[in-house]
Regions:
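Membrane-embedded transmembrane alpha-helical bundles that form the catalytic cores
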Residues: 1-461
Length: 462
């Protein structure tokens, strides 16, 4: 089941919420667990067993890690065992074919293998459960003794499919006791509508524009930049839209999840961009990989190693393809370049120039991200810089600029905080007008969903 479907919005969600608000508080965790299983099993009837296994295994290993607190050696062995099992499941389903194809490419031997579908949300709930185990090992949190409470954390439907990667430490008390009321429900519903509109009205239309541009075998320089601008906006509104919907659903259920995006396209450096984009994933790699490796408290060479390792892994987390690894290393190199060379210069130039620099780096980065075929990747990058391009600008570019101008302009404006700050002021001064705007956005989104084909969330495949 997905958030941007008529069935979820008009069948599952209202029925579930009605029951959730009517049952006694002590039964809400049970209902949330069962509802999450139904939500997941609707699209993954077999792989729901895998998610249950992950919940049971990590619940048990969490209690074992706490039990062995005073036996450092055994506790460490159990942690390593937990990591191996969690990553083995992830590697088997997500990287199995990739590894065999890579080995075959190196050895020249074709290794036949069945194609495995990737369980929805596997990367997200694996990292979520690992963070729980790491925090127990680091004595940041106590193991949850009630399986149902842990299972709710592990399987909760708002963030199961595509994040955010919510830490147990952030919602530990809310899992046991949380406040639900009309005010919080309203805030959550508003966030959900905002995310739905981002996805359906902006991201899906930007996807059409980008796909149309990429369908041309020959492009001008301007066309290629226009295309990657559309993809840049699509990816942001698609993923931040999902995050808004997930956080909104959490509010409606009584939970307060941390924000996952903080207007990344206004950043004045690549480093700042990654403090604002997919915050839950970035903080996960920082806390559980980068810092344990020594972070920046080591020699310069080791510091460089740490950054490159973290970003290669970040790229690989996004997909079983070498273009994602290349994308991660690309960002690792830019972060190193900023830290050791560019930082002092970026402080001296106007912030708007820094933002342009950052967006150019990010847009080029999204080319690596979007093209899994190295031939297509090289061709697109070359076209952006005039290699193999059909001139600087042509009729095709002017056509897409004309047809996509309003969409791109709205997208660029909505990437900035100003429209949302204005809306918050409107809520305070004219709440009825704010409600009407939300209803219009909701109606437009539903109309678009009814009359157009379904487009999945991009990050659901990661």
């Amino acid at each position: 089941m997905v958030f941007n479907s008529i069935f979820f919005i008009f069948c599952f969600l209202p029925v579930f919420m009605l029951i959730y608000y009517l049952v006694p508080g002590k039964l809400r965790n049970l209902l949330l667990f069962l509802g999450s299983l139904i939500f997941y099993a609707w699209g993954e009837p077999v792989y729901v067993i895998l998610m249950l296994f992950s919940s049971i295994f990590n619940y048990y290993m969490g209690t074992e890690l706490e039990r062995l607190y005073y036996d450092d050696r055994k506790q460490k062995i159990n942690l390593i065992f937990s990591i191996i099992i969690n990553l083995a499941v992830l590697v088997f389903f997500k990287y199995y074919g990739f590894l065999l194809n890579t080995i075959g490419g190196i050895t020249g031997i074709h290794i036949p293998h069945p194609e495995l579908s990737l369980p929805i949300g596997l990367s997200f709930y694996t990292f979520r459960n690992l963070s729980y185990l790491f925090d127990i090992y680091l004595s940041k949190v106590s193991a949850q003794r009630n399986f149902l409470t842990f299972a709710v954390y592990s399987t909760m439907f708002p963030y199961t499919s595509a994040g955010p990667i919510v830490r147990y430490t952030d919602i530990e008390t809310q899992l046991k006791q949380r406040t639900i009321n009309i005010s919080k429900f309203g805030i959550g519903a508003e966030l959900f509508v905002k995310g739905l509109a981002k996805k359906v009205l902006l991201a899906d239309n930007l996807s059409i524009l980008y796909s149309s541009i990429c369908g041309h075998p020959q492009m001008s320089v301007f066309t290629s930049w226009l295309g990657i601008l559309a993809y840049t906006m699509q990816l942001y509104f698609d993923f931040s839209g999902y995050s808004d919907m997930a956080i909104g659903l959490g509010k409606m259920l009584g939970f307060d999840f941390n924000k996952n995006f903080d207007y990344p396209y206004i950043s004045t450096s690549v480093s700042e961009f990654w403090r604002r984009w997919h915050i839950s994933l970035g903080s996960w790699f920082r806390d559980y990989i980068y810092i344990p490796l020594g972070g920046n408290r080591v020699s310069t060479l080791k510091h460089i190693r740490n950054i490159l390792v973290v970003w290669a892994l970040t790229g690989l987390w996004h997909g079983a393809s070498w273009n994602f690894v290349l994308w991660g290393v690309y960002y690792g190199l830019f972060l190193l370049l900023e830290k050791f060379v560019l930082q002092k210069y970026l402080k001296k130039i106007p912030s708007w120039l820094c933002t342009i620099y950052t967006m150019l780096v990010v847009m080029i980065g999204w080319v690596f991200f979007s093209q899994t075929d190295f031939g297509a990747l090289g061709h697109y990058l070359g076209t952006m810089f005039g290699i193999g391009a059909s001139g600087f600008i042509d009729k095709t570019a002017l056509y897409y600029l004309k047809t996509g101008f309003i969409l791109l302009l709205i997208s660029i404006l909505m990437c900035r905080p100003a429209p949302y700050q204005y809306f918050k002021r409107l809520v305070r001064r004219r709440p009825v007008a704010a409600v009407i705007i939300n209803l219009i956005l909701f109606a437009l989104s539903i109309a678009y969903m009814v009359y157009n084909s379904y487009t999945p969330f991009l990050y659901a495949k990661f």
